[in-house]
Amino acid sequence: MEKKLTIIIPNYNGLKFMEPCFAALEKQSYKNYDLLVVDNGSTDGSVEWLKEHGISSIFLAENTGFTGAVNVGIKAAHTPYVILLNNDTEPEKDYVKEMVRMMETSPKIFSVSCKIIQMYQKELMDDAGDMYTVLGWAFQRGVGQ
């Protein structure tokens, strides 16, 4: 049985990205997920669009940035796994399935990330995941490759 998870999407004035992102999520081969958008005080019609489409959302009064929004979403999630997904992404159909599969390979795994392809230069990577030093400094792998 598939474990349930929550996909958390932070949004700030990202109305133009909503339809492609949600269309890609509808095509996912892994279906056992909740979707939660945390809106950072958008003024571009995002709030109205989310309400019109009945998408589970939390509406913040001001822009708290990516970290603030996803932390609100994580606190609201009640599933064993969460996926943090930018609103300007169009994940491939097995994205969620593969993320869960990797998490399930070992109880020692705390988090997984995926290879992100640039939106406008699809032959280049935007990022192949973040790595952290023992001091907590983060750095990205694969940028521009």
Model-derived features with residue positions:
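Active-site beta-to-alpha loop of glycosyltransferases that engages the nucleotide-sugar donor
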Residues: 9-20, 41
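Conserved donor NDP-sugar-binding/catalytic core segment of glycosyltransferases
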Residues: 90-132
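Short, flexible, basic/aromatic active-site loop/helix in glycosyltransferases
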Residues: 132-145
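Glycine-rich, basic loop-to-helix element that forms the pyrophosphate-binding segment
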Residues: 59-77, 87, 98
